[in-house]
Structure formats: structure tokens, C-alpha cells
Design a protein with these regions (language model features):
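An acidic-aromatic
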Residues: 34-92, 140-159
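Extended beta-strand-rich segments in extracellular/periplasmic secretory proteins, especially
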Residues: 90-147, 175-178, 182-183
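A structural detector for beta-sheet-dominated domains
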Residues: 24-28, 49-51, 63, 106, ...
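Short, solvent-exposed secondary-structure boundary motifs
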Residues: 25-33, 45-54, 89-99, 121-128
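N-terminal leader/targeting segments and the immediate start of mature chains
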Residues: 1-45, 107, 167-190
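Short small/polar-residue motifs
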Residues: 7-8, 32-37, 55-57, 95-106, ...
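Short, hydrophobic/aromatic-rich segments at coil-to-beta transitions
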Residues: 16-25, 42-49, 111-119, 138-144
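Edge beta-strand at a domain terminus
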Residues: 64, 148-185
Length: 190
């Protein structure tokens, strides 16, 4: 009580950007398929692991300002340019956009739980509108829900730990580290 929903959401976002944390981000699309992304952050380093289904998993490590795309199957890491988006944007893709858009405080039922939420309407390039809701459970930003014509997409944030194993940010010693150009050349030879 006391703080508005908007203030509490902004506080939750600020905490997430600065904190050391290990979280699972689970995205459930309208057909019920769920995809899990692991995101960890500590000391300015970031680790992101995305489950790509049959293609295995994709790991991205940002360490000491250098980005690496790690492929466990081939034991290779491709050293790339660090994308211009900041780490916090990667981990919380659309979260900053709610600021300038008229928002409504609502209650959204997510997975059978009523959550206080801040909702706004977004229009995509094709003119389709969707309602995006930032949902709090207590003071924690737990879900970002998008309700669109094709159904509901739920992104759930599960912070599993506030301490991060620093080994996550290390590329295993037996992995080959290549530049993007070297990697492309190696692919061309196969």
C-alpha cells in the first residue's frame, strides 16, 4: 500500500537492471507452447541461454564488454560485436516502452491468479492492436502478458537466485573461440 502500481513496477524494473540475479523467463504462446530462457547477470556480465527446441540451445555470454555466442554442440564460441542494445534491454526486451504510453491500472488474471497490473495498448506494423500488461505479484514484476487477436502470450519471470555462479560467464577451456569472419570461413569449408 502507499506506492502506486506504476511506481512499484518501475522499482521492480530498476532492481532487475542493477541486481545480481539468476532468473528463468518462461514465454508461453497462445497455442500453449512454452519456451524457457535463462538469464543471469552479475558484475556487468550477462549470460543468456535460450532453448531452441530441436536445434538445441543457444548461449550468449557478455563478459568484460565482449559478446560471445556459444555453441555447445560444436564446442565453439563466436566472438562478436556487442549488440548496441544494452544487456538490460536484452533481458527485458519491451519493458522500457510503457513509460510514455497512456497506461491503465487494471487487474489481470494470469494462470488463475489475480494480479495488479499496468496495461497499455500497442499497435504493431500491420495495424493489429494488442494489450500489454505488466503484472505484479506483491512488489515483484512477475508477468508481462500480451493479449492479441491470436490469443494470449505470457512471459513469466522466475528469479531463482540472487547469487550467480561466476563460472557461468567462462567459456570452457576446450572450446574454440573464433571471430565472426573465422566462423563463417569454417562453415564454408564444411
Amino acid at each position: 500500500p502507499g506506492d502506486s502500481v506504476e511506481t512499484r513496477i518501475n522499482n521492480a524494473l530498476a532492481q532487475r537492471t542493477g541486481a545480481e540475479l539468476y532468473q528463468e523467463i518462461v514465454t508461453t504462446v497462445p497455442d500453449g507452447t512454452a519456451q524457457t530462457m535463462i538469464a543471469a547477470r552479475s558484475n556487468g556480465n550477462a549470460y543468456i541461454k535460450m532453448d531452441m527446441g530441436d536445434a538445441g540451445s543457444l548461449v550468449y555470454i557478455l563478459k568484460d564488454g565482449q559478446g560471445y555466442l556459444v555453441d555447445d554442440a560444436s564446442k565453439m564460441a563466436v566472438r562478436g560485436e556487442v549488440p548496441t542494445v544494452s544487456t538490460s534491454e536484452i533481458v527485458s526486451a519491451d519493458e522500457g516502452e510503457a513509460q510514455e504510453i497512456p497506461c491503465t491500472v487494471t487487474t489481470v488474471n494470469v494462470n488463475g491468479q489475480d494480479c495488479e497490473a499496468l496495461s497499455y495498448t500497442a499497435t504493431d506494423a500491420n495495424g493489429q492492436t494488442a494489450t500489454v500488461s505488466y503484472c505484479l505479484v506483491g512488489d515483484d514484476l512477475k508477468y508481462v502478458v500480451t493479449d492479441a487477436a491470436e490469443g494470449r502470450t505470457i512471459v513469466e519471470y522466475r528469479v531463482t537466485s540472487t547469487t550467480v555462479d561466476q563460472n557461468l560467464f567462462n567459456i570452457p577451456a576446450d572450446y574454440q573461440i573464433l571471430t565472426q569472419a573465422e566462423f563463417e570461413a569454417a562453415q564454408a569449408n564444411h
